[in-house]
Amino acid sequence: MALDAAVKQTIITEYATHEGDTGSPEVQIAMLSQRIKDLTEHLKTHKHDHHSRRGLMLLVGQRRRLLGYLQKVDVNRYRALIERLGLRR
């Protein structure tokens, strides 16, 4: 389930560190979090959709790796991001 272009743009403007920023860890993690949220809602309705469940697990793993990278590089940015996204860590 891909994100809508409008949703993507709002996430980019909200989490970008500078103008035209689409690849910073903050933006990538925020986009992954939105996709995870959407897939979780989908799986509440379609409990036996195992292909989507596997995709969800891949997204969670990718977000976890990016969070680990951000924590190693800059702890303050990491803490600010998990607080803004409301992630438990």
UniProtKB/Swiss-Prot annotation:
Gene3D superfamilies: 6.10.250.3130, S15/NS1, RNA-binding
CDD domains, A to Z: Ribosomal_S15p_S13e
SUPFAM superfamilies: S15/NS1 RNA-binding domain (SSF47060)
Organism annotation: Beutenbergia cavernae (strain ATCC BAA-8 / DSM 12333 / CCUG 43141 / JCM 11478 / NBRC 16432 / NCIMB 13614 / HKI 0122)
Keyword set includes Cytoplasm: no
Any one GO BP annotation for this protein: translation
Protein name (database record): Small ribosomal subunit protein uS15
Residues of the signal peptide: none
InterPro entries: Ribosomal_uS15 (IPR000589), Ribosomal_uS15_bac-type (IPR005290), uS15_NS1_RNA-bd_sf (IPR009068)
One term of GO molecular function: rRNA binding
Keywords: Ribonucleoprotein, Ribosomal protein, RNA-binding, rRNA-binding
A Pfam entry, by short name: Ribosomal_S15
Binding partners and assembly: Part of the 30S ribosomal subunit. Forms a bridge to the 50S subunit in the 70S ribosome, contacting the 23S rRNA.
